[in-house]
Amino acid sequence: MTQEKGKFAEQLALNYLKENGLALVMQNYHCRLGEIDLIMREGSYLVFVEVRSRSNMNFGGGLASITYEKKQKIIKATSHYMIKYRIQDKFPIRFDVISIDGKSNKITWLKNAFDAGC
């Protein structure tokens, strides 16, 4: 996915999540361990969101495109974020995936798509 398409997909996802009652905490959190596209708040939960845009759905949707290694990077970046901001054990967390069909811009929201145990 090109950087321009990625930013467009993230903005679509962000707007969709806000329309569904989530609040933005941070966008594009980067650390040496990995990155997190969106960090949102839903009730008491901190929700760490991976955004995937697929122009060809023949090989599965967004979740199918997230490898074990990518999940590990997201989990490590989440730990880094929680420690950096001293909020570990203060909020329950969840890992969601927003999958966007690159042709139609149809959004699929997979709540609790994976956990820290992968």
From Swiss-Prot:
Gene3D superfamilies, per database record: 3.40.1350.10
Top-level taxon of origin: Bacteria
Molecular-function annotations in GO: nucleic acid binding
Pfam families, sorted: UPF0102
HAMAP family: UPF0102
Similarity field: Belongs to the UPF0102 family.
Protein name in UniProt: UPF0102 protein lpg2994
Biological source species: Legionella pneumophila subsp. pneumophila (strain Philadelphia 1 / ATCC 33152 / DSM 7513)
